[in-house]
């Protein structure tokens, strides 16, 4: 077997339509386009979303919401995720290294979901009231 002898398996690719080759082919004369009308002509297709002059769906419905540009730079981390980082001091750099927050994140907030694995010191990261209580109850501390 050589690379130049390899071909597609039989039936894996549909055969090319040969139009205009007689009545018996079912693609003769009008070539499967029917009689007259816009879709029978060359270049006779309308743009996507065109509804024949009726107000298109995209324009009938109101605009809703927006995507905040700030979302890229703010992240949330749970107490359970913090325990994966390990003990010691936890800051923005440590969370980025552990892959818990995106590298472009500028602000991080720890939320009280789950439980703290051990004693940790949180430095330079926002903390909710519940998360602060859980960290301090586990013997850790929160530094601003």
From Swiss-Prot:
InterPro entries: Ribosomal_uL15, Ribosomal_uL15/eL18, Ribosomal_uL15/eL18_sf, Ribosomal_uL15_bac-type, Ribosomal_uL15_CS
Keyword set includes Repeat: no
Molecular functions per Gene Ontology: rRNA binding; structural constituent of ribosome
Keywords: Ribonucleoprotein, Ribosomal protein, RNA-binding, rRNA-binding
UniProt keyword Lipid biosynthesis, yes or no: no
Gene Ontology cellular-component annotations: cytosolic large ribosomal subunit
Pfam families tied to this protein: Ribosomal_L27A
GO biological process terms, semicolon-separated: translation
Region (Disordered): 1-25
Quaternary structure note: Part of the 50S ribosomal subunit.
Function according to Swiss-Prot or TrEMBL: Binds to the 23S rRNA.
Family classification: Belongs to the universal ribosomal protein uL15 family.
Protein's name in the database: Large ribosomal subunit protein uL15
Source organism of the structure: Methylococcus capsulatus (strain ATCC 33009 / NCIMB 11132 / Bath)
């Amino acid at each position: 077997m050589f690379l130049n002898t390899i071909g597609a398996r039989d039936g894996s690719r549909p055969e090319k339509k040969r139009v205009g080759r007689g009545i018996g082919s079912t693609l003769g004369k009008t070539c499967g386009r029917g009689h007259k009308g816009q879709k029978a002509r060359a270049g006779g297709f309308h743009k996507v979303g065109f509804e024949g002059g009726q107000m298109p769906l995209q324009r009938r419905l109101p605009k809703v919401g927006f995507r905040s540009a700030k979302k890229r730079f703010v992240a949330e981390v749970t107490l359970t995720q913090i325990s994966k980082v390990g003990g010691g001091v936890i800051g923005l750099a440590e969370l980025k290294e552990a892959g818990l927050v995106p590298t472009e994140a500028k602000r991080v907030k720890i939320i009280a979901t789950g439980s703290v694995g051990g004693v940790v010191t949180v430095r330079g990261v926002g903390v909710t009231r519940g998360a602060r209580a859980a960290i301090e109850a586990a013997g850790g501390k929160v530094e601003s």
